UniProtKB/Swiss-Prot annotation:
Phylogenetic lineage: Eukaryota, Metazoa, Chordata, Craniata, Vertebrata
Superkingdom as given in the UniProt entry: Eukaryota
PROSITE patterns: G_PROTEIN_RECEP_F3_1 (PS00979), G_PROTEIN_RECEP_F3_2 (PS00980), G_PROTEIN_RECEP_F3_3 (PS00981), G_PROTEIN_RECEP_F3_4 (PS50259)
Main location class: membrane
Residues that carry a glycan: 98, 301, 454, 484, 569
Name of the coding gene: Grm4
Tissues expressing the protein: Is widely distributed in the CNS. Predominant expression is seen in the granule cells of the cerebellum.
Membrane topology: Multi-pass membrane protein
Disulfide topology: 67-109, 249-538, 372-388, 428-435, 520-539, 524-542, 545-557, 560-573
Organism encoding this protein: Rattus norvegicus
Pfam family, one: ANF_receptor
Protein family membership: Belongs to the G-protein coupled receptor 3 family.
Protein name as it appears in the record: Metabotropic glutamate receptor 4
Amino acid sequence: MSGKGGWAWWWARLPLCLLLSLYAPWVPSSLGKPKGHPHMNSIRIDGDITLGGLFPVHGRGSEGKACGELKKEKGIHRLEAMLFALDRINNDPDLLPNITLGARILDTCSRDTHALEQSLTFVQALIEKDGTEVRCGSGGPPIITKPERVVGVIGASGSSVSIMVANILRLFKIPQISYASTAPDLSDNSRYDFFSRVVPSDTYQAQAMVDIVRALKWNYVSTLASEGSYGESGVEAFIQKSRENGGVCIAQSVKIPREPKTGEFDKIIKRLLETSNARGIIIFANEDDIRRVLEAARRANQTGHFFWMGSDSWGSKSAPVLRLEEVAEGAVTILPKRMSVRGFDRYFSSRTLDNNRRNIWFAEFWEDNFHCKLSRHALKKGSHIKKCTNRERIGQDSAYEQEGKVQFVIDAVYAMGHALHAMHRDLCPGRVGLCPRMDPVDGTQLLKYIRNVNFSGIAGNPVTFNENGDAPGRYDIYQYQLRNGSAEYKVIGSWTDHLHLRIERMQWPGSGQQLPRSICSLPCQPGERKKTVKGMACCWHCEPCTGYQYQVDRYTCKTCPYDMRPTENRTSCQPIPIVKLEWDSPWAVLPLFLAVVGIAATLFVVVTFVRYNDTPIVKASGRELSYVLLAGIFLCYATTFLMIAEPDLGTCSLRRIFLGLGMSISYAALLTKTNRIYRIFEQGKRSVSAPRFISPASQLAITFILISLQLLGICVWFVVDPSHSVVDFQDQRTLDPRFARGVLKCDISDLSLICLLGYSMLLMVTCTVYAIKTRGVPETFNEAKPIGFTMYTTCIVWLAFIPIFFGTSQSADKLYIQTTTLTVSVSLSASVSLGMLYMPKVYIILFHPEQNVPKRKRSLKAVVTAATMSNKFTQKGNFRPNGEAKSELCENLETPALATKQTYVTYTNHAI
């Protein structure tokens, strides 16, 4: 090798050459070893083309030891699978005919640094040894046996080991096909360009595990990874996929140290328990770490708390769960889709110490598998271990189950064989055996053929590689189940680009088929919105929608429209029920009772007055105004029915008209009466001439003028604000929307009601003032005193009405209280007028007709004299209340018959 290219090649490999020069004294020579014999710590099988093999025959050593205990399944089964595949290829006349494949198989001891040391054996043949200055004793040059050239390597198992070895092999352009390494880092074709694998990348596995987590409705899980490329890269891929897919949050991401200290696994379990809601644990760890995690969980008495989800490093292996079945129950594991190779089962079951001497570790396996010792000297005194007889048989005298990666080891060897076959077909057409173009085999060319292979594997599955050397993602999904005291891995689904999971076949500890929960927060109930925790989308607080809010979506509450309220579960809005004062309501009983009794009494009085219309007592009461007053009283009672009737345009219009009109008619008539009395007595003090407008016609005119003012105001109100009914949702808008009601009522505000009743109140107050002023008039001459008592009582009623009516404006029962208060007040006012002004007269008419006779007439002078003397008597002790003196003067006056031209104007008694 010369020129610039040669120097560049040597400079690139200078550090490795220095390493090899240091390592060379310990690298055993293969000179003189017979074919098929063990080669110290490696297996060597001669052939035309040699393939390297890397297998974890032993576990990682402790306390400074490179290697630990023997791994029967993961080490011996896989190693024998390569030997089985080589035998099949060498015996296949259609694959590499007349070309024998040899092997150099090394033990990695499950440690990347040890694997690096071992893999240097593969590149020895590529390092030219300079023997120019080395001379034999005879003075001649030394005879150097060149080691076999390894054209490709099968392995390694662990991803961290494969990464370490791949960095060496790529320098010497030696293709590598792994049967178990799944770390996503190895898909980087710029760094590991000579690396390929027949198992899918953990990127696919991570996606499959995310899909399983989502199918189980978990959204809050923790991850657990062995330190190294496999564990850390797998967890990183899982976290990345969970972010891309959304809906899965990582509670904790815990790393298992490469060299764990005592109590390390107990600390890991304690840390996982800090987020106790994250019961799902995603594990990317080697089987030793898996086992120690399960042991720590059992020591912490957490059997059944955690639900494990293991990667392909757990798969369907029995070693991690041996004697830990209860802790591992329910574990979901994933494994690249595979099938048991029956031919390998027959092959492996037939292996004995006699026919398998090429495997230098088989004797150690034999002792471990059958719990015996080959050498009698190895037997300890008092030990229960027996001596091996060599008559033991695998599968008969010991348990046997094919290891999960056996199929992939065979596929990896066949992939190398098919690539070499295609290469031989192209480079050596028609040649038997190797040709110069394949001696030596060019690694770069071989890599191209490896990437282009496409054949059916030993289990019938297609074996192909993508541009990064990865196999397509195809997985079987298992669950570790306990049934009737026996444990087994049961296939519950598969994943090929998308998930096929049979949840009904899953069994969980303590809950049967019910899916366990691994969630940060319980789902919010209907009517509750999520308030997510910052930085943790899967964790939230549930806040109920309050008041009149309803749940718009998972994160938003919105207030219902004004005329609506939320449904019971607050997921939507519904119309607020509309209520009104019903006829059968308790609030309507008293008003209706008073109204009915009042109307009956009023009609009774009217009928009585009509029947006895010409009797003296009816005439003396002033028939015209009496009937007007009775009409007003009747309207006051009738208003109750309008107030309780269902509000509509007609009802609301009638309410506006008659609510104040009945009172206006009543008080206008009473005011006219009291004003007439007052004017007569005031006029009599100054003159004997009669005041103006005291005739019945004038009195009616005055009364109707007063009433017309009320009607005029109502007409103006109708023009300014037409009458209509409304639904008031504010009156009964309670804090609890369940009790909210819309009140159907007439559109009459409190201010409008004050204006409506204000005029009637003005008439009432004015009438009361006149009643007070005429309180000194003798009772036998007028109705001033009954009117006064009527007005005093009415004022008391309305003074009680005002605080009750306006003091309940904020009550939820405002409609009922105010309507009842108003109608009762109006009815009581009418009842007071009816009772005090008419009932005594009706009583006399019906029960004392002897008193219903004409009385003598009195002149105005007599009336005035009586009034004057009455005022004088108020200064003495012999007086009646309100200054009414008992005078016989007016009682004994005899007035002659009325003449047409009489000097004094006379008035009928009681008509004044």
